[in-house]
Structures are given as C-alpha cells and as structure tokens.
Amino acid sequence: MIFNASQDSKTEIEYQTISSTQTYLAEEQSERLHNLISKEQLEKLNQAFNERPDSQVGFDDLRGLLLEQDITFNDAVYNRLFLKINQNRDFMVDWNEFVSYLIFGFQEEDPSSQKESLILPISVAPSVRKTEHRSTVCCVALLKAKSDQVPIEEVTETVNFSFGGEDSPEASGMWVTASHEGMLRFWTSHMEPIRTATSESSKPHAVYCMSYAFYNNGKVHSKLVLGDYAGNVRILSYSPNLRGPFQAKPGAALIEVVWADVLKGKIPQMIPKEYINLHNEMISCVHYSLHMNALFATAEYRNTKKYRGRCPGMIMVTYDERSNFRVPLGVSTFFVAESHNIVVTGGPDTFVRIWDVYIPTEPSAILTGHNGGIVMVFVQPEENKVYSVDYQKIIKVWDLQEHTLLQTYGELVRLIHPSETDMTYFYHSHLRELIVAGRKLISIKCCPRVRVDLTDGNTHAAPVSVVLYNRLFRNIVTCGLDSYIIVWDPWSGRRKIIMKNCHTKMIYGEIIDIEITAATFDPLEQFLLTGARDGTLKIWNYNNAVVVRNMSIMPDQEVTSVIWVVDRILAMGWDRQVTEFNDVEGREYGDPKKWSKFHTDDITCADVKLGEGVVTATYSGEVIFWKLETGQPYRRYSVMDPTRFIELKLTPEEEKLMRRSKRLMSRLGSSRMSRATAITMPKADDGRDYGQNVPISVQAVLFLQTRPQTIQHGSVFISLDTGYIQVYSHHSRGGYMSQFLSVHKTGDCVLTMCTDRKNRYIYTGTAFGYIKVWHIVNYCVPEAEKVHVCMPRLRLEFIFMRKEFWVTRAKRVVRHQREPLLVSSYKAHLKAINSIAFINLPKIVFSGSHDYSCRLWTQGGRYLGTLGTVLPWSKLSPFERAGSENQVYRLPPDIKKVASSTTLKVISGVQMDRPAKRAEVKAPEDRDEETAQTDDGYDLKKIFDKPLKEPILGKHFTLPGKSVMDQRIDVDTTQSYIAVYTHLKVHHTEMLERLPTPAVISRVAGENYMDHYVPVEGKVDLSGSALNIKQPPRRNVRPNDPRNMRMAKTRGDMGPGPSPSQQSE
C-alpha cells in the first residue's frame, strides 16, 4: 500500500516501514527529536518554516531542513518520524504539528505521569467489628515494633510493594484501646482480641495527649512527650538500651514513678524537661521530631473575643527558639512529614493548611472543602497524598504537590450512628490503615501496598477488554471496562499516557463511565478507534488524548467489533448489521451506510481480509461472508451444520422474527436486557447442553492474511463455545473444511485468537485463562504446499513438546490429532483471556484478561512481566528476540499457587522430571553371585527368615464382594438430554417401629417436684452434702412464742414418720 507524500515531489512513503516486516537494524536509532534539537536549531527551523508558503513543508523538504541542522536519519527511521509528526494525515507538516511532536516527547518522559493511580486511594471496603468495651473507646494507641522515624543516613528509596510479612506481630505491632471506665484491650494487627487489663490513676493536671519518638537502632535517646489540660508540655528522655528504666525488677509486677522524684533526679535513667504554660489552653496534640530535634505542640483557641485570631495555634520549639504558627481558632491535629520538611495542620476552622517547617509566617497551601472541623490529618509522603477527616466523619484525600482533591469518602457516615460524635482516630503508617474507634472498631486501608507474594499488580482498574500493538510508535495500547485507555512502553515497562473517562453517559445528572468493548488502529496506525457498550464510537489521537471524531451505530447497542480500512470504518454489534462510516476528508460527517441486514441475532465478532472480504458471526452461530468493496454477502453458514448450503435470503419465520424483534426493541428502548458476550467469563461448572435445539455461539473469528482465496486453502478460523475451532475457505465456492478441539477442559472455549505475520502459528486465549500455540503451516492447505517440519527445532523453542514420563492432560487430548500441532499450552491468567496479540520481531505474546492484567510472554511461554507492575522491569528491545536460555524466569505469584506440572515446566523453562531407570532383569546365576557378594545387612533372607503368610495385613476391614446380580442400566439416549431421575430406583419409606419407653423414664416423667420440696429455715452446710441441712440454734424456748407454735404445727402436720425427702434419700 503506497501513499503520496507531497504535492510538490514524487516521493512515496511505504506502509511497509511501520510494519514488522522490516529486517533487523544493526543499531537502534532514536526518533526523539526533543533530545537532538537545541534552542538555536529550533529557532532556525522556525524561521525556515515561516519562509515556506503556508508555513508547510513536505516529506523531502522536512528532511532537508533537518539535514541543514546536522540531524540525520536513515530511510526507515525517517519514514516513521514523518508519520508521527504528520497528525493531520495530509502529508504536509506545519509548525504547530512539529512543535506538538516535541512537546509530546517531553511529556512522555515526565515522571509524574507514572505515579497517577488507576484506582481511588480508598477503594477497599472497610472492616468493622465490635470494641468489646462497656463504653465508648476514648483512646487508640499502637504498640509499635518499628519506629516511624528513621535516621537520615538510613533512609532508603521507598517502594510501593511488600512481600506479605508486614502484617505479622513482629513487624506491625499491637493495637491498644482504652475506654472511660479504665479498661484496656490489646488487639493484633488484624483486630483480633488478645487480652484485657484495667488502670486507675489520678493527677492534678491530667495528661491529655502523649507522643513517643524513638529510633530502631537505639543510639539516640527516646522521647516521651506529655501534654496536659493546663497547657504544659513535659518530656522524658531516656536511653532504650536494655529497656532503660523499664527493666523488670524481681518481686515487682508494676513499676510506679512519681513525677516529683523524676524532677529531683532520684531516677537517673530519666532526664526530664518541662515547658510550663507553653499554651494558654489545653494541649491538643504533641510530637517530637528526632530528625529536626524539635518539639511540636498545638492547642485550640475557640474564644475569639479573648484572643482575636492572634493565637499561636502551633508552637515549634528547637533548642531555645520558638516558632509560632498562627492559625485562627487554633489547631486540633497535625502531622509532620520529615522527608518533605512540611507540617499539615487542621483545626475547627475547617481548613487544612500545609506549612514549611522553616517558614511559620504563612502556609504554603490551604485546602478547602470540609464542612466541619478537622479532627485528624496524616500524610503519605511516598504517595504524595494528604488525608483529612472532619467532625462529620467525611474523609478527603488531597494531592500533596498539586493541592487538588482526589477523593471524598463518606462511608463512615453509614457505618457510625449519628449520635456518636467523639471518635478516636489513629493511622498505622506501616500497614497504611486508618483505625476509627467508638462503639465499633473500623479499619480503612488507605492506598495499600501491592502484595507481590500474591500478585504482580494490575494493568487496569477493571477487566481488560482489548490489547493492541502499534507498529508506528512501537507501544502497546490497552482498553478496559473501566473506560480507560492506557499507552505503555513495553520495552521499559513505563506507562506513557493514561486517558480516563473515555466513554461516558449522563444519567440523572450523574456521569457514568461506559465500558470499552472494541478497538483498532487506522491503516497508518496514527489514530485509535474505540467502540463502547452504549453504541458510541470515538476516534482518538491517543498521543495527546484528544477526541477527533464521535460516531454511533445505534443507541444502547453494544459495539462488539470495529474494522478500519482505507477510507472506510466498519462497525458491528448488537444492531445485527454492519454500519459503514466514511473516512474521506470532507465526507466524514455524512450519514453512515447500513449494509443489508441478514443476521437474525447479535453479532459477536468479525474480521477482515484486506482487499477481499469481511466475515461476521453471531451469537446463534450464523456466519456470513461479505464482499469488502461492495458490501454484498456471498456465502452464509451455520456452525451447527456447516456443510449445509444456506440461501442468502430471509425465511418467512426469520422475517416474522425480525419484525417481532423490531417491535420489542422499540418498546424496551434503553432497558434492553444485557446478554453475556465473549468478555464475560463462563463458569467452569456451567451445565449447558449442546443439543439439537440449543444454538452454538461463535466467540471469535480470524482471517489468515497470507493464504489465498482458493477452495483448497482454509483461511478463516472460527471459534465456538463448545471448545472447537472450525476452518472455512472464504472462496465463493469454498466452505467448511475441518475442525479441531482447542481446549483440554470441559466447559472451556477460545475467546480470542491472533497469528504471526507469516501465519505459521495461531495463538489462542481461552475462558479458563490458558494460552495455546498451534503450528498451522501444513493445516488445511493443498498437499503440494505442505513443507517438512523440523521437530527437533520446535522442541528447542517450545519446551512443551519435550517428552515426559507421564503424558499430561493437554497432550492426551490431542494425542490422536496430527494437524494442527499443539506446540505450547500453559495457564497465563486466573480468569478469562479477552484479547491476545503478537509482536513479530521480538516474538512476544501479550494477553489482556478479566483479572485486570495484561501480561507479556515469549513465544515459548516464558513470563516476561505484567504491565503496571511495581517490580523492576526486565529491559526488552523491539529489534531483538525476547528471552534467552541462560535467563532465569519466574512465575506469576497467582499462577504459582494453581499451576499444573505442564504450566510450571513451560513458564519456568525447566523440565525437572526424568524417566526412572528400570532395573535390569538378570539370570538366576548372576543374581546368586551378586547376593553372595552383598553385605549381610542387605541380605533379604536374613531380614525375613521365612515367607510371609496370610493374612499379611492382619485383622482389617475387607470390602464387601460384588453382587451376583449384574444391575445394568439402559440409558435412553434418543433425546438431546438424558433424564436421569427416570432411571433411578426409588424405594418407598416404611413406618419405623417405636421402641417402648423404659419404666424408669416413665416413673420420673410422672413425678412432681413438689412432693420432694421441704420448706426449711436455716443455713446450708457447704462442707457436706447439699441435703445436709443444719437448723439454726435456738437461744431460748418460750412456750408462747408464735415461732415455736408454727414449727410445732409444721412438725405435727408432717407426722412422726420419716419425711418424703428422707425416703427418697
């Protein structure tokens, strides 16, 4: 394909220059002009552009201008450079296009673009549990195992991943909660209770807040800072060596220290220091920075008439110098970020202020947006985020550098009762968790680290729907159901551009993101076309995230496939027809052309053979071949009966069905029920029965571009949801040729397919996350074109083909299948693979899955990495083949836990198992000679003096023998399904005979406990039996005493005989 480059010259640009058909370049030449042009050269180029007519230059003219500035390129590199600069696709470059390309080059190298998060800082549901306190929790503390403050010489580069050991008690510490009744409870880092204690104390000026600063190395004295209700601040300094003053003493379970004794020096291990009346009000928060050797103390000044806004909300004491940070109404809470030398404060005035610790006169930034007083602030310096919580339990997340609002989190309002206002907050910097305590304990993860022992990270915040490789810019473009488009540099693993909210829709005043379901490039691969679930299409200049054009096929009809050929754009989906848009300058905004509507169900997939035809397939198994130039159909098939000839016209039943579907669509409108497409992952235990009346849907189609349009060549591969792949010839007199089973698990099917440039291999991605590579050189081709396949060469490249002692499941399925040849099979993702693509020169396969990740693999199956990972990236080159035999490859952490022996062998590249050597059977004479020469310890005759006799296993349970009657079940297989319950023998239940009730139970059931009740006045003798009752001693016996008369009357009623209790005893 050739395009005219300039109106003034006959120079031509070949499309071949951006494809991977170009040979290996001896030396990679940079196309980044911003690294080669200086300021003086740029001014000369500007002057040269202005001297040209219309300030535009052509293909040769631009190359001449660059040569004048001593900037040279070879032909292949310059062709690519010109296509990158020429964004208007008119093959004329103006000054604005030239400068825009330079600006985009600088933007790609901006490190801030790498730190933009795909998800919100607080995106995980909080964990809630009861506090087990009798009253509301008033204080939360952390028994730290590691200090938050690190000496400046020990500061290392912060990483955003962990290996899973930070949540252990040795690393994360224990939580301590306290309530007003004096109860203390200790919890693990996962909020599991450990033990309970009580505490009682009384002081004239109670301590309101405390802070503890220490280093892990123990070389610097630790500081315990106390702030009380009178505005005083006291510091206790002591050495942590050998537990300092907190050493255990024999016979003393509790160490009590009196402050007066500390001041008098009676405890030499403690060095006290007091700041009396540091504030005029109660101390609200204190902190001691060992790095700056400074004390920070804050207080609230709510009496505006008394202080008139000139109150020192926060005071920083360094040696004998004091710095006052004046804040109206004072400061309630603050956080010191020593790595950035900043202090973030919050108070009753609802403002969050960011201060430089060395400039106390005015804040460097003021963050507004809260509607209540600030009660908690903290900073994540490694993430450049500020978190603030107000009195109304609303959490806001801010960007520390841009001072912009990132997220507003209001889930606490739902979890906490409105009557609970005085909540307690504590931030665990090691686990990145915010603990909220009141009547409940709530744990909120704030931008948690990636557990590299569980996953390598995610590429998108939702399932990845489409992955593409751009041969012009040599980058990978991923589109997801989160409505994101991300451009990646696969050679360095960097994220170049991220475009959020690409397809949106406003519903009831709220902007909703629409999932991206299809995408492709233009023929020159300068622009990107995306299709969404609501039927909209957009053309993007994805280098600057600008929408060039908006289109739509039909409202609320999902776009399942898009095709971009020269001067035309084809889109198809749930509208059951092909929609053609013009891509010619001046006619791009006309009405689209609708092709004939022959499909009776939703179109699920489509593909194109350049210059020849288009194939479309539906959910009901219909396959139609179209002429690309005219848009007319010429063949129609059904995958359930592929050999049957189907005439290209609608039957009366189909016409009736079409009219009914039109009426139904007009009634339902936008409330159409969504149908599961190829993006949704089928369940493994799906009990779908592929009978005669159940349609078989088509999941993917693939055109082989190098195979000619003949009857003998199978050029179209069609994947079915039964797990089979059918092969067709797209010739007008061709048709169905063959099929093969492409999966080895029941219920699995191929969702996406791709091939290499020469159509030697086909790469398939399945619904269960498997990638399979098939060798198709000799498959469905004439006998004269079949070539010899060098099997040893394939075994060197694909370790899957090497022999094993046990035949694995993937090989057992295809052991009787000669063509196509399965050369590799491994599990690449835990969920369905929605899209797969191949890079020809470096031989890299990359797949996008429903598990939010896009992973890169070598052609042999070695794991290269996941786009968006936090781990170091192994450097790749677009001109060298990826992978080497000497390199050690690792497995994805999530695959490692579920991988089979085949997957472990393919991904790691190591075959551990070896066939066991069988012992040679020797003659009896040789055996006797060797027995005589062996040691006595290995002589079997000495170990066993006589043969074993039955029973060898001793007394053990033996299985019952088989029944004499052979019960054969004749299953009715004439129907499309087997009625199992009709073949089962069901026995009727019989009434069970009720056993007689024992006499003892009948007699006890008939007894009355009142017969054994004896009213007695006295005390029970606990030393003896429970029935040994002692009468109280009588002081004096009076004949007229009414109490004696009552006792005598009672004994008279009972009679002289023994009591019932005595009888029972």
Swiss-Prot record:
Compositionally biased spans, kind Acidic residues: 926-936
A Pfam short name: WD40
PROSITE patterns found in the cross-reference section: WD_REPEATS_1, WD_REPEATS_2, WD_REPEATS_REGION
Positions with biased composition (Basic and acidic residues): 915-925
SMART domains: WD40
Region (Disordered): 915-936, 1024-1065
WD repeats: 153-197, 326-365, 369-408, 459-498, 511-550, 598-638, 745-784, 828-867
Keywords per UniProt: Repeat, WD repeat
rRNA processing among keywords: no
Protein name (Swiss-Prot/TrEMBL): WD repeat-containing protein on Y chromosome
Organism in which the protein naturally occurs: Drosophila persimilis (Fruit fly)
